[in-house]
Amino acid sequence: MTGVQTCALPISAVASAGKSHRLTTKYAATHYNNAYEFGWDKTDPFRRSADFTLSPWSVTFDGLCHRPGTFDIDELMGMPFSHLEERVYDFRCVEAWSMVIPYNGRPLRDIIKVVEPMGSARYVAFTSVYRPDELPGQASAFSTLEWPYVEALTLEEAVHPLTFATFGVYGDRHLPQNGLPFRITVPWKYGFKSPKFIVRITFTKDRPNATWHRENPSEYGWYSNVYPSISHPRWRSEDVV
């Protein structure tokens, strides 16, 4: 896994690593989630997300780009939700479980090119929403994470054709337990590298300090690519179900 991976994904790589599975049921994929903004239990995102405000939602682009700005979620989609592309990707968690999920969205690179990253931009940081009044996990005195959540990719990874700006799952855009209304899905990486509830995208020259990597770099490598031949320190990658 993560701690032993020190190189970025070659740009020619594809999301074919791992086993092939049938589609996970929508019920399973929406009732067993990691979204620590709602709490640490797998059922917390479903149970505690009813009052989470999905609309209005906007995303700010800043940093090393020629056309910074703030865009409404519908502007980012660029088309009616029903016309978005559907992609089926494996979602692999560092906890040694996985799901096969249909995501609705468009290539992230199509959005990134609109804001025109500068030649000096090498990384992209994704910052998630901070609303402790709506997100009990953020308000909890027992949370060990530093909020808001930040994850990052290299710019090369962010504009890879497989990196997916995601606005829905199973044809449904109203599932905050799955990180909606706007998240990124990166199929060749472990799940925590696919940030949820994104409200800011920042282009940088220096490598951002991502949340989980900052918390425990030996467990959560900065790249965290899924290589079936390279195992996690505590389990074999090929055993991820």
Pin down the residues of each PLM region.
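Short, small-residue-biased leader/transition segments that mark boundaries at the very start
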Residues: 2-9
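Structured, non-membrane catalytic/scaffold regions adjacent to prosthetic-group chemistry
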Residues: 13-241
